[in-house]
Amino acid sequence: GFPTLPAMNKTRKLGIVMDPIESITPYKDSSLAMMLAAQARGWQIYYFLMDDIFFDNGIAMGQFKTLTLFDDNDHWFEYGETGRCRLDDLDAILMRKDPPFDLEYIYCTYMLEQAEENGVLIVNKPASLRDCNEKLFTRVFPQCCVDTLVSRNPALLKEFIERHQDTIIKPLDGMGGRSIFRVQAGDPNTNAIIEAVSKEATSQTMVQRYIPEISDGDKRILLIDGVAIPYALARLPAPGENRGNIAAGASTRGQPLSERDQWLCDQVGPELRARGLMFVGIDVIGDFITEINVTSPTCIRELDRDFGLNISADLFECIEQRLTA
């Protein structure tokens, strides 16, 4: 028969599962940056909300809208055609739905996993999204972390606070700096704070030794397939705040990685790659990793702007290599 055309001529299809595109903030949205990079490389973009992904007789399907993207803060997308496809008709899928990391999120990862079994590259790997909870995954790298206790037992949490004198307490399932408190030994509100954060001893809670360097802010470092982008985004807390989240009003500035930052990345990089975590953001305060964000890391656009990078293009370079491997 006739030789088939080389795969190069076939338009690559990218699925993206995300929050509603009309409500993003374009100039700082990493998912938009990724779609713009994919589009520039000739990919066709298929957009899904979590509600659009479904199992039909065990086949993972999706109701899509195709998108055209624009790097424009007033007009950043247009819908094209609407349709339905098997997820395994796509070449790659970006799972960019923000937490909450709840059962609904987990069900969606099972649907994506079925497409993965049929050869679709999912970024990040669905099983690893389930296994590598943002705050708990740091336990794999104790050499990179400050003293930490995870418990929902108020007595244990209180004992840790007494022992370390100055601590940060946060719910394991929080996002964007919500419900993060600094608690010092002897604080008359300690019991009330433990009760609130642990939802009356029903929710696992993380308490960590306070890292004084937080006054210099925290740093977000991005890794693509385990290799760090050589610049970090330092987030300076709003005056009087303990929280270095952009969502909590922090200001940002880019800076090159320090030697210690690079060491931390070298510790975690191989494990991230082995687990199929192709795009990850780690949060660093002082000398320590405080969180490893695998679900929907951001800060691409800020670093691109500050240093003339194109981080999303690097990501797609990596995705395309993986697909042709």
Predicted regions mapped to residue ranges:
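Phosphate-binding site of ATP-dependent enzymes
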Residues: 30-31, 154-155, 162-166, 173-264, ...
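Short glycine-enriched loops at secondary-structure junctions
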Residues: 126-130, 235-237, 285-288
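Short glycine-rich anion-binding loops that position phosphate/pyrophosphate groups of nucleotides
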Residues: 20, 97-100, 172-174, 297
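Conserved N-proximal alpha/beta basic substrate-recognition cap immediately N-terminal to
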Residues: 11, 22-150
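Redox-cofactor binding/interface segments in oxidoreductases and associated redox assembly factors
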Residues: 16, 94-95, 169, 208
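ATP-dependent carboxylate activation and anion-phosphoryl transfer catalytic cores
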Residues: 12, 18, 24-27, 239-240, ...
